[in-house]
């Protein structure tokens, strides 16, 4: 029988996954939109949207992960093991997938845009996303 704490953690975990998907898909939509931005349109609002969407995604996912980790620490040992085996690999896979797609879109922006400012910003964000993927893979997904 699962405890009340475990059910609460599972509920928050699923909400975290939904938030993560929505945040990253929003970021990807803005990034893909930047690809098709006409040359006559001022590029700074597009860059601002990309940066804000990326930062909001990272901050939201970090806060969610910290809340889930705090709740995870209050579980008994048998429920911790069940959570790790049942739910955690899915989160690592989703984060790797979304950040991986994000870095691909940003790299595409880098090499197809005629605007040097967008190229530099896209390259920096792609580098950050690739770093996040490597950290998640090394510390999390690899351990399973």
UniProtKB/Swiss-Prot annotation:
TM region positions: 16-36, 48-68, 87-107, 120-140
Subcellular location per the Swiss-Prot or TrEMBL entry: Cell membrane
UniProt keyword annotation of Lyase present: no
Main location: membrane
Record has Cell wall biogenesis/degradation as a keyword: no
Bilayer topology term: Multi-pass membrane protein
Keywords: Cell membrane, Membrane, Plasmid, Transmembrane, Transmembrane helix
GO cellular component, one term: plasma membrane
Protein known as: Uncharacterized protein MJECS05
């Amino acid at each position: 029988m699962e405890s009340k704490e475990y059910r609460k953690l599972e509920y928050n975990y699923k909400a975290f996954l939904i938030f993560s998907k929505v945040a990253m898909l929003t970021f990807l939509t803005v990034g893909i939109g930047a690809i098709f931005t006409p040359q006559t349109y001022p590029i700074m609002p597009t860059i601002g949207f990309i940066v804000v969407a990326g930062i909001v995604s990272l901050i939201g996912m970090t806060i969610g992960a910290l809340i889930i980790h705090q709740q995870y620490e209050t579980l008994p040992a048998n429920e911790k093991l069940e959570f790790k085996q049942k739910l955690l690999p899915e989160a690592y896979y989703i984060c790797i997938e979304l950040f991986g797609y994000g870095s691909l879109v940003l790299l595409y922006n880098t090499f197809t845009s005629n605007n040097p400012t967008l190229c530099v910003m896209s390259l920096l964000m792609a580098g950050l996303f690739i770093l996040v993927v490597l950290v998640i893979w090394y510390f999390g997904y690899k351990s399973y």
